[in-house]
Amino acid sequence: MPGTPNMTYKFTKAIIRKPNKSIHKALSSQHLNPSYEKILDIHKNYINCIEESGLKIILLDSLEDYPDSIFVEDPALIYKNNIIILNPSDLTRNGEAKIINSEINKYFENVFVVKHGTIEGGDILNINNHFIIGLSNRTNKLGAETLSNLLTSLGATVKICQTPKDILHFKSECSLIDDDVILVSNRMAKLDYLKSNYKLIELPIGEEGAANSLRINDKLLVPDGFIEAEEILTNKYNIIKINVNEIAKVDAGLSCMSLRW
């Protein structure tokens, strides 16, 4: 909760999946098709940046039958030494959850599975032992409450909020970047719960894409191409810019491509 030393962005390991050639079929609200070759370049740079941040990479094989499978954050959540398998909203992604369970459960002490409702990792913001779950088109009330009950039983506290309309995932336009400091878009800055409990750094209209940044240890990975965001963050943080244009075509951001702990 606010006011406590933050360990949320202190990591030693990351799970990442190799890109799949079928990614051009990934879910996209924009109906755009990313280039596999360009995704490969982004992915390579992403891994390099995470390794430079001091993390050991666990690299999973690509899954051609699952176009969205490179985005490993959605079907699973890590808390303490537990892995929680989530329940993605689109039926095409349910198989991903089962597969990633079999691939990574050996790295964790306990495995839990959310069986009721729909919930995706992109709607879950972790801040120490506190979680904010955003209701969205991908995460419904039953899924949020099911996960909330599970996390509470593991010692966490949870707040369920409504994601603003037309934002795909709660974290599409916000990210934890420091102790109790959340980087937000103009729309996310209006959420009463965030305003009341955290220090917000609000990005200007037009730079919403930079709000999904990724704090890893002493570095802050920031989507490239957002000039004002860079100016706001450069003096306060050790930023690394990463081109995410191609994954943005399928509504994805920096946090989507890894599970970190």
Segment roles from a protein language model:
Residues 2-261:
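The feature marks the mature, well-folded catalytic cores of soluble enzymes
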